[in-house]
Amino acid sequence: MVELEIFEKLPLGGTNIREVPKKLEAEAPALCEKLLKQQVKKLKPQGASLPEGHLVLLLGGSNGILRAVAIQLLFGEKIPVYAVHYDRRMMIGGHHVKAITDLAAARGVDTRWFNADATDPKVIDEAVAEIKKKYKVVHLINGIAAGATKRYKELGAINVPDLDVAYHPVLQYPDFSSSDNIRNFGLVAVPLADDADIEKTNKFMGSSTTLWAEPLAAAGLLARETSIVAFADYDFEKDDPVYGMGPLAGAKILQRESMAKVREKFGGKTIRLCYPAMDTTAIGAIPGGLIMFALSTQVLAEEGKFKNLMQLAEETMEIFKPGYTGNELRADADFQACLPEMHRREPYLTKENIQEHLHLLPKLELP
């Protein structure tokens, strides 16, 4: 294996953070509106259906895979969606939400978004009270991604291979539209987690489903054997030096345990939504995340099996089709199958040839 140089991975691909709020204010509204209309124009109904008085509630949804799910539900299936997201002034999410709510209002589809901490009891109570005014049954999808992308300190420090990729200056996702945006391939350091990191990750990604299930059930909105309670999961490899050996892994285990409790206590139809590595803002923050996405995507594209966020959202609609009885949706089946070939290629990657090894990515419709 070629010896790789260590480089520092910067937030948003090294974007000047001080300039972000000004750039978003100037360019994001029009760009988010344009992108949404382009995506909605291509939507095809997938046959998802919910009875009158039913609502889908998303934890997350302003960006990434749950944004795509929200778009498909609202504009492809005409299903009402409420969401609780948390976006600060320098994040693109709030602008995506504005575009979604404006278009939904124009098309007569009910949606409401709360920009607040989804683990705050006051926020939960407020949202539940608002939902109860109009709806009888809630279906919950938890997509909170707010964990520490670090290793347990007892496992020690490590460097892992990763990419330096330019981000879209406004939409804030790793931008593979040009090979020139792939600027470096080398090693990045994996930070070590402290107790506060572990506690925060467990709160947001481990127990947050239970925080909502209790008050929803108390309000009569979580219907036994009817309400779907799902969470967006990543089925990491057990030997993954970051995801498999830090707070993210621990939180995912807690999340799965909490889902079992929801099923036993409230009779919720619990479903694990397994997604592949995806081209999102969040994956860029995970050491090793970008090379995992890029190389697996290259392999999948060669096989004609790559799916972008909107295509994965279409697949997610399966859980809302009449008669669906599964407890796990494997939207990552092709991704999991491609991992051996991806790992076979890894030793041959260098800083000099990385663009060649990822030559199909600029031809794909990302994210």
Give the role of each language-model region:
Residues 1-60, 71, 76-78, 88, ...:
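Non-catalytic terminal and boundary segments that flank Rossmann-like NAD(P)-dependent oxidoreductase
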Residues 77-95:
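Conserved glycine-rich Rossmann-like NAD(P)H-binding loop of the short-chain dehydrogenase/reductase
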Residues 107-111, 127-156:
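A glycine-rich helix->loop->beta "capping" turn
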